[in-house]
A protein has these predicted regions:
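NTP/phosphate- and nucleic-acid-binding module
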Residues: 1-397
Length: 397
């Protein structure tokens, strides 16, 4: 039996929606197209932001903050870039509300120029960069630089338009985490991103048990919170809800908490804890001495982090095929043969604008060019030109 129905294999799209629902990550909001990110989902997002913020600052970058609104004229400067999502933009046309005769409210104070609620940041950042002497991952070439007049002085003292990139992330990373690590029992969270590393589940049959067990759980939580892990300390939650029938345990399995500790009177008497790890089958549990568990919690979490990472790498390797023939490439993405699913394709590639139409017909695009190249010369699948550059191709969904 599994906690999530349907399973990944039965209906991937519905499985994904059920994981979000059962993990209580988010829900729809009254505003169409918007969602409410709930505590677990937002805890994940906060940890992702903090981790990436450290990585960005390690490269010497600094943070800035830009307005939510973009003047329509800014958007129009780079029409090609916004074409894909222009129809999804919200537009602000008035600056206030006023009372209507007979009750209710109506917009008033029409703006001289409509404002776009920005779906992306390049246009407004580009306009500011033009005045400075000095964010997905895209090579934008000189498109935004020309539109926003961003120039620099080269070694010869001549002015040139800047070559710009855009890189950053959104809450879509949470979706990637679900798809990469989730299973048929729900969400699986790598420890370094988990809002809580350990959840303690007190088990008590009567009031006398409750007092003893809760005192033990509070002491255990305090000891665990003093242990270092990652950039901080172990984060612990005690779930003291009065639930029976395994419902409390399964709620945390579906929520992906890395470690579950079930603590009852027998554990107190034995000075032990009963441990369940989210990187292992839900039914698999082990008993550890109290002191041993506390002292080794950091090592256990690091082991889980490593196992999940290696599992993800193995999954990627399993779904990546090296292809050097155009016919095989087309079969890979046609999906007409059993066992051919169209995952990642690693192929020799020469960047040529004329290739775009060929890829569009297959609904495939270049996803990235790996830093580590095979240093093997082969013919580009699309131009036939010899090259030692290899690229990763895939479909975007």
């Amino acid at each position: 039996m599994h906690a999530i129905h349907p399973t990944r294999e039965q209906d991937y799209s519905e499985w994904y929606q059920q994981v979000i629902r059962e993990a209580d990550l988010a829900e729809t909001s009254p505003a169409r197209g918007c969602m409410i990110i709930k505590p677990l989902g937002y805890g994940l997002w906060e940890n992702m932001q903090q981790t990436l913020d450290r990585m960005f600052k390690d490269t010497g970058h600094q943070n800035v903050y830009f307005p939510l609104f973009i003047p329509l004229s800014f958007f129009e400067k780079e029409a090609a870039h916004v074409e894909g999502f222009a129809k999804e933009c919200a537009v602000v046309t008035h600056r206030r509300l006023e009372a209507k005769p007979g009750g209710g409210l109506q917009p008033a104070g029409e703006l001289e120029e409509p404002l776009i609620v920005r779906p992306t940041s390049e246009t407004i950042i580009g306009a500011a960069f033009a005045k400075w002497k000095a964010g997905t991952s895209h090579f934008l070439g000189q498109n935004f630089a020309r539109a926003a007049e961003i120039k620099f002085q080269n070694e010869a003292g001549q002015e040139e338009y800047a070559w710009t990139t855009s890189w950053g992330v959104s809450t879509r990373l949470i979706g990637a985490l679900i798809m990469t690590h989730g299973d048929d029992d729900g969400l699986v969270i790598p420890p370094r991103l988990a809002p809580h590393h350990v959840v303690i589940l007190p088990i008590q049959r009567n009031e006398a048990d409750r007092v003893r067990v809760m005192e033990y759980c509070e002491r255990l939580a305090k000891e665990l919170r003093a242990q270092p892990f990652g950039e901080g300390r172990v984060r612990v939650e005690i779930d003291a809800r009065n639930m029976g029938g395994g419902g409390k345990t399964w709620s945390h399995i579906k929520r992906g908490v890395p470690i579950r500790l079930e603590i009852g009177p027998r554990d107190l008497d034995a000075g032990s804890v009963t441990l369940g790890r989210r990187d292992r089958p839900a039914q698999q549990r082990e008993s550890m001495a109290h002191e041993q568990f506390v002292s080794s919690i950091g090592e256990i979490l690091e082991d889980m982090q490593s196992r999940l990472f290696q599992r993800a790498l193995a999954l990627r390797r399993e779904h990546t095929r090296e292809i050097t023939e155009r016919e095989e490439f087309e079969r890979w993405y046609a999906g007409a043969e059993e066992g051919i699913h169209g995952g990642f394709a690693l192929c020799p590639f020469v960047d040529d604008p004329r290739i775009a139409a060929q890829l569009a017909a297959l609904k495939v695009s270049v996803r990235c060019i790996p830093f580590e190249q095979a240093q093997r010369r082969s013919a580009c699948l699309f131009t036939g030109k010899p090259t030692d550059q290899w690229a990763i191709f895939a479909r975007a969904y």
